[in-house]
Amino acid sequence: MTIENTQNINIDTLSRRYSTQIQRRKTRSVMVGNIGIGSDYPVAVQSMINEDTLDIEASTSAIRRLHEIGCEIVRLTVPSLSHAKAVGEIKRRLEQNYLPVPLVADVHHNGMKIALEVAKHVDKVRINPGLFVFSNPDPSRTEFSNSEISAIKEKIINNFEPIVNTLKAQNKALRIGVNHGSLAERMLFQYGDTPLGMVESAMEFVRICDSLDFHNIVISMKASRPPVMLAAYRLMADAMDKEGFNYPLHLGVTEAGDGDYGRIKSTVGIGTLLTEGLGDTIRVSLTEAPEKEIPVAYSILQTVGLRKTMVEYISCPSCGRTLFNLEEVVAKVRDATSHLTGLDIAVMGCIVNGPGEMADADYGYVGKGKGIIALYRGREEIRKVPEDEGVSALVELIKSDGKWIDP
């Protein structure tokens, strides 16, 4: 294809691979409290408290802290009937003293009775297919007979059907949450420790829900290694397409760790799938306070262009042409403007590449000469000011345009 030909091609005619706009996979809408999950809604951010649910006061406070900083859905662990009943009091206190925060109950080992109780108090129940009907693995086993497989499937249906029916009756949601590290022994024998085994674990439960005409379902396929997680979600989307299902996906890299590496792992896994159009809600899992997960989640969503909830800063890496201490100035600009939302602000070290590279920014701060800063609105240079007045002059420019709000 020649350069002349490419000039006449509309971006809509190009493959999705070359589009600069993410085209989300079309999924059905599932309501979790007042938050919608699905392609008709923004990608939702969620997290999980690490308090013992029996500590009602601490759990209520932890949920509120997360919600106040932007966590839209909060999960809590429910390992027993006592915990399930405690959730009812937690929800009551939230509604009475704060807001009705969308809550998800995490139910694992042989959790039918727990799920039936906690479904009264939460907006969504999460079950793990690998642990739902659980028995300790037999190290001497070499295979599963057809009769054993049939018996296990029947037990799953008998235990799962009451949960589906109660969620359906209450118009609540279900997450079928597969973890790579906890596949059922039967699945490991049949498919190995593979993404395909994860997909089949989920699809078994999806088909049961479909047979009961229950469709308030969200699906997750989490693994601690991004390549496994990526393969599992892609396979899951393909499997659903093949069988005519369009349930939303909850993305996450489980056990991502802490610090920079934990954030990088989560970003690689979650961000990659989002750019492919997969994912309707996300959770960044860090071995840190849950509150630290929320800014990372919103940063991922903003980076890929799906939600804009903060200032987008554009700044060059600095070089020998830089006319001021770029790192120091970026920090000052951020301190002065980080409370704003929806703006793009560029800080560039010199005029060689600065104006061109910041062309899409709302405002620009560019080194013009020794001790001189040029301020831009879009592509237009507005004024030159001494360097020591640059940040305050930028703030005044934003104010004059009516785009400033006080912190």
Swiss-Prot record:
* Binding-site residues, [4Fe-4S] cluster: 316, 319, 350, 357
Keywords attached to this Swiss-Prot or TrEMBL record, sorted alphabetically, are: 4Fe-4S, Iron, Iron-sulfur, Isoprene biosynthesis, Metal-binding, Oxidoreductase
Catalyses which reaction(s): (2E)-4-hydroxy-3-methylbut-2-enyl diphosphate + 2 oxidized [2Fe-2S]-[ferredoxin] + H2O = 2-C-methyl-D-erythritol 2,4-cyclic diphosphate + 2 reduced [2Fe-2S]-[ferredoxin] + H(+)
Which of the seven top EC classes does this enzyme belong to?
A: oxidoreductase
Q: Name one GO molecular function term.
A: 4-hydroxy-3-methylbut-2-en-1-yl diphosphate synthase activity (ferredoxin)
Q: Which cofactor does it need?
A: [4Fe-4S] cluster
Q: What does this protein do?
A: Converts 2C-methyl-D-erythritol 2,4-cyclodiphosphate (ME-2,4cPP) into 1-hydroxy-2-methyl-2-(E)-butenyl 4-diphosphate.
Q: What is this protein called?
A: 4-hydroxy-3-methylbut-2-en-1-yl diphosphate synthase (ferredoxin)
Organism this protein belongs to: Prochlorococcus marinus (strain SARG / CCMP1375 / SS120)
